[in-house]
C-alpha cells in the first residue's frame, strides 16, 4: 500500500500527507480537518505569542483526537546596523504616508518566543514538532525527545539534510524551490541560498540519509504525491494546496490572487521579511528590487513592513502586501480541507488501479 511506511507509523497517521505549518494562515479547523482526514495537520506558530499557541493547541484538541504538529521558527543570528534600519525606514516612508501609518518601533523577541514555544509544546504534549529556518540546539532537541515528541526538520539542500539527521531529527522535509512562502534554508554555500527543485532535491537527499524524507514544493494533488513516492520520499508536505482552502486563515484577497494566477507569476524575494520567500509578484516587490541598500535580515525587515502589509490587505490592495504562493497555482482549489484530502487520496487510488 502506498500509504503504509515508516513515516505514517512514526507520526501515527493513515496517509503520508502533511499540511504545512504556514505561520499566520493556519486555523484550528484546518489543522483538525487534515488530521481527521488521516493526514498530519500542523499549527503554524511562527508569529504566535505563548498564550496564542496554548489556545490554538487546546482548540485543535477540541476538534480532533488524532495526531497533529506545531511548526516553529528557529531563531537565527540577526546581522543588521542602525543605518540599515534608518535607510529602510526612509525608503518605506512614502508607503506609510499613503496608508496613514506611523514608523514602527522594532522589537526583537525571537529567541525568547522560540524558547516559550518549546516549553508550550512539551507542556501540552504535542505529538510532532516541525522546524523551519534551521536546527535548534542540542539541549532543546534532547528535551523534546525525552518528551517523546517526533521532530521534523527542513532542508533545501543535501548538506542541510545531513545536518538535520546528524542533529537527531526523526524526518526531514526536502523543500524544493517551487514551494510557496519562506525558504527554510539555513546553510549558505558561497553566500547563495540553495534553489534546487523538488524533483532534483528529493532523490539526492534520499540517497544520503537514513530517516524518512518528506517532499515539498509544487505538490498539489495525487499525481504530485505519487511522483514524490517514486522519487523515494515517504510523504509530502503541502502548503499552497491548503492555503486556498475555505478552512485556512487566508484573506479573500490572497485566495483570489492565487486562484487567478499562473505558474509564471511568482518570484522569490526578501522584500517583505528579510528572508527569501516565494510569492506572487507585485508593485512592492518590483519597487523594492530597485533599493540599493542592504535589506535588513529577518525579523527586522518583517517588523518594518508589517504595518504596511496589514493595512494594504485590509483595504484590498494586493500591490503592497505579501501573497505567498507556490509554483502550481493552476491546481489550487477553494474546497474544504477534508475534500482536498479525499480528492488527493481518491486520485492516487485511481492512478494505482490503472497502472
Swiss-Prot record:
Biological processes, Gene Ontology terms: response to toxic substance
A molecular function GO annotation: nucleotide binding
InterPro entries per UniProt: Aldolase_TIM (IPR013785), NMO (IPR004136)
Keyword terms: Detoxification, Flavoprotein, FMN, Monooxygenase, Nucleotide-binding, Oxidoreductase
Domain of life (superkingdom): Bacteria
Family annotation (Gene3D superfamilies): Aldolase class I
One Pfam family of this chain: NMO
Cofactor stoichiometry and binding remark: Binds 1 FMN per subunit.
Annotated positions binding FMN: 71, 175, 180, 218, 237-240
Names of the cofactor(s): FMN
Anything else known: P3N is a potent irreversible inhibitor of the key enzyme succinate dehydrogenase in the Krebs cycle and electron transport chain. P3N has been shown to be a toxic metabolite to bacteria, plants, fungi, mammals or any organism that uses succinate dehydrogenase.
UniProt function note: Nitronate monooxygenase that uses molecular oxygen to catalyze the oxidative denitrification of alkyl nitronates. Acts on propionate 3-nitronate (P3N), the presumed physiological substrate. Probably functions in the detoxification of P3N, a metabolic poison produced by plants and fungi as a defense mechanism.
Entry's family note: Belongs to the nitronate monooxygenase family. NMO class I subfamily.
Protein name stated in the entry: Probable nitronate monooxygenase
Amino acid at each position: 500500500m502506498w500509504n503504509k511506511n515508516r513515516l505514517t507509523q512514526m507520526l501515527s497517521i493513515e496517509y503520508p500527507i502533511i499540511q504545512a505549518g504556514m505561520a499566520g494562515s493556519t486555523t484550528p479547523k484546518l489543522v483538525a480537518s487534515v488530521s481527521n482526514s488521516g493526514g498530519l495537520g500542523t499549527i503554524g506558530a511562527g508569529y504566535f505569542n505563548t498564550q496564542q499557541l496554548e489556545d490554538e493547541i487546546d482548540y485543535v484538541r477540541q476538534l480532533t483526537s488524532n495526531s497533529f504538529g506545531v511548526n516553529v521558527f528557529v531563531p537565527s543570528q540577526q546581522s543588521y546596523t542602525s543605518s540599515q534600519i534608518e535607510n529602510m525606514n526612509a525608503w518605506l516612508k512614502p508607503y506609510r504616508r499613503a496608508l496613514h501609518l506611523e514608523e514602527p518601533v522594532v522589537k526583537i523577541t525571537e529567541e525568547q518566543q522560540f524558547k516559550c514555544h518549546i516549553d508550550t509544546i512539551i507542556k501540552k504534549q504535542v505529538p510532532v514538532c516541525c522546524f523551519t529556518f534551521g536546527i535548534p540546539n542540542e539541549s532543546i532537541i534532547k528535551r523534546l525527545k525525552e518528551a517523546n515528541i517526533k521532530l521534523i526538520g527542513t532542508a533545501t539542500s543535501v548538506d542541510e539534510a545531513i545536518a538535520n539527521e546528524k542533529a537527531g531529527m526523526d524526518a526531514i522535509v526536502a523543500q524544493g524551490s517551487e514551494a510557496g512562502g519562506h525558504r527554510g534554508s539555513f546553510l549558505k554555500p558561497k553566500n547563495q541560498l540553495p534553489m534546487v527543485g523538488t524533483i532534483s532535491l528529493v532523490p539526492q537527499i534520499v540517497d544520503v540519509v537514513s530517516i524518512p524524507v518528506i517532499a515539498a514544493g509544487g505538490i498539489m494533488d495525487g499525481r504530485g504525491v505519487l511522483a514524490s513516492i517514486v522519487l523515494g520520499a515517504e510523504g509530502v508536505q503541502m502548503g499552497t494546496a491548503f492555503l486556498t482552502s475555505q478552512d485556512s486563515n487566508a484573506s479573500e484577497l490572497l485566495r483570489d490572487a492565487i486562484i487567478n494566477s499562473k505558474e509564471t507569476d511568482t518570484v522569490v524575494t526578501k522584500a517583505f521579511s528579510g528572508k527569501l520567500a516565494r510569492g506572487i509578484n507585485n508593485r512592492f516587490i518590483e519597487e523594492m528590487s530597485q533599493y540599493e541598500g542592504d535589506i535588513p535580515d529577518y525579523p527586522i525587515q518583517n517588523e518594518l513592513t508589517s504595518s504596511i502589509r496589514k493595512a494594504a490587505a485590509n483595504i484590498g490592495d494586493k500591490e503592497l502586501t505579501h501573497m505567498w504562493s507556490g509554483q502550481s497555482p493552476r491546481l489550487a482549489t477553494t474546497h474544504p480541507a477534508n475534500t482536498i484530502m479525499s480528492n488527493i487520496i481518491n486520485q492516487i487510488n485511481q492512478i494505482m488501479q490503472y497502472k
